Amino acid sequence: MAKMIAFDEEARRGLERGMNQLADAVKVTLGPKGRNVVLEKKWGAPTITNDGVSIAKEIELEDPYEKIGAELVKEVAKKTDDVAGDGTTTATVLAQAMVREGLRNVAAGANPMALKRGIETAVASVSEELLKLAKDVETKEQIASTASISAGDPSVGEIIAEAMDKVGKEGVITVEESNTFGLELELTEGMRFDKGYISAYFMTDPERMEAVFDDPYILIVNSKISSVKDLLPILEKVMQSGKPLLIIAEDIEGEALATLVVNKVRGTFKSVAVKAPGFGDRRKAMLGDIAILTGGQVISEEVGLKLDAVNLDMVGRARKVVVTKDETTIVDGAGDAEQIQGRVNQIRAEIDKSDSDYDREKLQERLAKLAGGVAVIKVGAATEVELKERKHRIEDAVRNAKAAVEEGIVPGGGVALVQAGKTAFDKLDLTGDEATGAQIVKIALDGPLRQIAVNAGLEGGVVVEHVRGIEAGHGLNAATGGYVDLMAAGIIDPAKVTRSALQNASSIAALFLTTEAVVADKPEKTPAAPAAPGGGEMDF
């Protein structure tokens, strides 16, 4: 395919035009009085959203150079969303301001590489100040405030704070669609996995369709069980103890399953069989987690353990198990606390090393099942469009709340950037074009506050100057138009969100400024449709 090449100012201006189109569509959503954007879908109803990354993802421009510019800014929004769950619009506004100021200086003859160094030095200094400004999250109310701002709904903030309070820092909070209207929080006690009983005959409570056992033994096997001969020795030992038995295996079939069902129906021996969760290596890892949690061992021929040689020391214990047709919950496993902590540390190390978002998410789920707990927020709404938008907002708010717990909170409303900038630039000792690069960042830091004010119908420049002159930590409450102590008023942002937005924006801005040529695919002309034979006349 033929390529088009643009150089110098033409290349940079093409990229800037694309960036401006995307940024202008995204920045109208910033702040409590930000507007919504309607996104057309090829199939189904349009989506209405004020989430920066969702809007950015939908924008595809026709001009090849503009398209590349827009793609670069999409990357800023996506990266910020991945890291912190929020701050996508802030990152876009910062990137646009830095690029606009930077290109003006490059056109005036500044050295792009020196500007880049100045930008990077200034951003590092501001990031440091942000972390100094940050206060640790100490109360449930602070988590609720942070999540409420992200979701734009106080009731969402409260339910997320409740969930985090229950499952702890390591816990997993998932968001699911519900058929009922409103919000509902469901907490899981103990470890839960998505596999239920193999046969309905194992139920002990037909009304609730559950098998519930107190103080059971738990046999964990990493293979299929089909022969009753292999299973008999351990069954006899468990029967003598008078306790029920939960068997977790790759599969249980044939005479082994029939024997368990017959004994359960006759009331001779209480047991329930479930399939092991996951597949392949992930299944092995999850069985290992269950074994450590319950104080048992995984019976696997790989490590020389055979089913017919199992004794009671090798099986796990728990205070209670609840098995439904879809899931199994193990409450209060009898595992050794030190071993569980060791496993938790091992999973944490794997999370740090992992490059894949999917793997990291699965490892985080395993960690939550061992160390914290699992909370499910069920979301309902009147229409499909509202449901999708609400679910997305709540998922972002959950990540936002976790970011707040991680690195602390700073005053919200774009004020933290302005006030961190006041002290950060005093320390810098830069000259020439590097000092100009730092000045570009200083001007850009006002961008988010200015845009929040504009979206609230106020004069951006006046608001920025007023905030610069008032006490640290005070700023504009755009919802009311007054100036307040932001922390006390609950207008807060996670430091991680603000820091990530600034760092990602500066990274893309530096790329824009140092670009000297752009190579793009030449759009192919679509051939005109051939004329219909006979002049295209139709005979009716």
UniProtKB/Swiss-Prot annotation:
It is found in: Cytoplasm. It catalyses: ATP + H2O + a folded polypeptide = ADP + phosphate + an unfolded polypeptide. ATP binds at residues 29-32, 86-90, 413, 477-479, 493. Gene3D superfamilies: GroEL (3.50.7.10), GroEL-like equatorial domain (1.10.560.10), TCP-1-like chaperonin intermediate domain (3.30.260.10). SUPFAM superfamilies: GroEL apical domain-like (SSF52029), GroEL equatorial domain-like (SSF48592), GroEL-intermediate domain like (SSF54849). One of its GO terms (molecular function) is ATP-dependent protein folding chaperone. The keyword Cytoplasm applies. GO terms for cellular component: cytoplasm. Keywords: ATP-binding, Chaperone, Cytoplasm, Isomerase, Nucleotide-binding. Its EC number is 5.6.1.7. Its main location: cytoplasm. Together with its co-chaperonin GroES, plays an essential role in assisting protein folding. The GroEL-GroES system forms a nano-cage that allows encapsulation of the non-native substrate proteins and provides a physical environment optimized to promote and accelerate protein folding. Belongs to the chaperonin (HSP60) family. Forms a cylinder of 14 subunits composed of two heptameric rings stacked back-to-back. Interacts with the co-chaperonin GroES. This is Chaperonin GroEL 1. It comes from Salinispora arenicola (strain CNS-205).
